[in-house]
A protein has these predicted regions:
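Beta/alpha (TIM)-barrel catalytic core signal, keyed to glycine-rich beta->alpha loops juxtaposed to Asp/Glu
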Residues: 1-153
Length: 153
């Protein structure tokens, strides 16, 4: 949708949905446009409202009015199980990241090939804010491609 208006608006920065699973940023041509024009990009939902972290064991029962009730992946037990499996694989591959392995991986994988990018993290509590403060260790291209392959296959 952003690409439809990008030449009219001519922004300095855009804020698309992008994470290891939702890749329209790449497939729409927006990533190429950002790179070609050296624009800033701030990724919205880099952990897809938490579902990509593998922290859920079952279909969550969000309270009425919680927007996550409308996100299909939260209602898909097969998807939830795959995210748990991905988390275990990541924690096994990156023991040096400790308890931050999943966040380092999810964010590092979307930032590695996007030099003008940042991510918007919605910290809901003190612990999440503390984790965010510890992030930022770079990953190799090979590690990032491995992480992406977990979520895109």
């Amino acid at each position: 949708k952003i690409m439809k208006y990008i030449d009219i608006v001519n922004p300095d920065v855009v804020q698309p949905l992008y994470n290891v699973y939702d890749i329209e940023y790449e497939t729409s041509g927006l990533k190429d446009h950002i790179t070609k024009n050296n624009l800033g990009v701030c990724f919205f939902s880099p952990i897809k409202h938490g579902i990509l972290t593998g922290k859920y064991n079952s279909i969550p029962d969000f309270p009425k009015g919680d927007f996550r009730r409308s996100i299909k992946e939260f209602k898909d037990m097969e998807f939830i199980a795959k995210m748990k499996k991905n988390r275990k694989e990541i924690e096994s591959k990156f023991p040096n990241f400790g308890e931050d392995a999943i966040m380092q991986s999810l964010l590092g994988a979307v930032l590695f090939d996007n030099p003008t990018a940042c991510v918007l993290l919605g910290q809901r509590n003190k612990m999440q804010a503390e984790i965010a403060g510890r992030l930022g260790k770079p990953l190799t291209k090979e590690d990032c491609l491995w992480i992406l392959s977990l979520y895109r296959n």
